[in-house]
């Protein structure tokens, strides 16, 4: 069951009694955390299910371990609506989505340890799919997804490409996937 549907703004979900009923029976509750879903604590309290309350074995926080972006130095209304803990829109970045998937996997294994192998296999398949779509098959086969992910998260991916060659050509020529498609726009100012 999903409380916040993909076509809804998670900031403004209107809790309904049926949500509390669903949470009363739930084994797992996944929250983005931070200050995205300010309606969550009241809903969890109303449900009265200790397994999905913060600290319960079925409570999963998506943002754990994700480097937060846009953390304000000071929160005030002069900049409009500001997320005081940083940008909670984690799944707009494929690499941050992988960390969210890792967090969900940890939580699922906590609730159903007998299915850990299944959850790990799903995470591995998802991670490989994202890596291949982001970097392209060739670079994944050459360097491995974890290496490329680490370099990208450290902001060193293009620096690395600038110092490496493969078959006498700059390594960046092997870049495929979404980043390869977007390469002509790198360094350009875009207005969307």
Per-segment meaning from a language model:
Residues 1-192:
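Extracytoplasmic metal-acquisition and chelation regions
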